[in-house]
Design a protein with these regions (language model features):
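Short secondary-structure boundary/capping elements
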Residues: 17-21, 50-51, 81, 114, ...
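N-terminal cationic-hydrophobic initiation segments that often serve targeting/anchoring roles
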Residues: 30, 56, 60-63, 90, ...
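Histidine/acidic residue-rich metal-binding segments in metalloenzymes
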Residues: 85-100, 106-217
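Short beta->alpha connector loops
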Residues: 18-21, 77-81, 174-179
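Divalent metal-dependent hydrolysis catalytic cores, especially in the metallo-beta-lactamase
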Residues: 11-12, 25-50, 66-78, 94-108, ...
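Glycine-rich loop at the start of a catalytic domain that most often binds anionic cofactors/ligands
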Residues: 49-57
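Short, acidic/polar
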Residues: 19-28, 80-92
Length: 217
């Protein structure tokens, strides 16, 4: 075999940032991918339909000449996200999901959700409108070991959330543990997960033995 032809793939979790960073990286994605789910954790974050549409235009304007690429926009959930905003997003053709970042869990997550119960009305609206919830699944409590954060999130947050909203479409993003895999497989078909290739091939020993190897992070 000398040649393998595949359909142009999509990227289901993409950070392109904004400004100069966007200009630097977008071409590498648009050269290979047809569409991408665009992460909304900018500073400030993309919390409204209006902001998402402006950001979409910025991305399209940064594409290299001749590239065709469709950014699929996502809202960043906060404690103050309104049901009205979710309804607007659910009825907008360019916005495909909303993202749950536990406050303090990752880059630009300081304005994320402090307690998932605070957004239950929002989740109810998302369930009603068929809008997917993308989840960064990590507990940030200091007493939880950093390598147990994903499993603790399942036990303390995600399991209860799915029980309360059984028809909500949920994507547990970039999972890293057997706990997460087993949990998703135990759920109904409206709960799914994404996993990166390096998390299939490497573990924390690859990252830490002989000194920190950051590219295995």
């Amino acid at each position: 075999m000398r040649k393998l032809t595949i359909l142009k793939p999509d990227d289901w979790h993409l950070h392109v940032r904004s400004g100069g960073e966007l200009q630097s990286v977008i071409g590498m994605s648009s050269a290979q991918m047809g569409r991408a789910i665009i992460m909304p954790n900018l500073s400030p974050p993309i919390t409204s339909v209006e902001q998402a549409l402006i950001y979409r235009e910025e991305i399209l304007g940064a594409l290299p000449n001749g590239h065709t690429f469709e950014p699929l926009m996502v809202l960043y959930l906060t404690d103050n996200t309104s049901v009205k905003e979710i309804e607007l997003a659910a009825n907008n053709e360019f916005i495909k999901a909303a993202k749950l970042y536990p406050s303090g869990a990752t880059t630009n997550s300081d304005k994320g959700v402090t307690d998932v119960s605070k957004i239950y009305p929002v989740l109810e609206s998302m369930q009603k409108n068929g809008m997917p919830l993308l989840v960064h699944g990590e507990i940030t409590h200091k007493e939880v070991d950093i390598f147990d954060r994903e499993a603790a999130f399942i036990d303390q947050v995600l399991e209860k959330t799915i029980k309360n909203f059984p028809s909500l479409k949920v994507v547990f993003e970039h999972i890293t543990t057997k706990d997460a895999k087993d949990f998703v497989l135990s759920c109904k078909d409206n709960v799914a997960a994404t996993i990166t290739p390096h998390h299939l091939l490497a573990n924390r020993n690859n990252m830490l033995v002989g000194g920190i190897q950051p590219h295995y992070y």
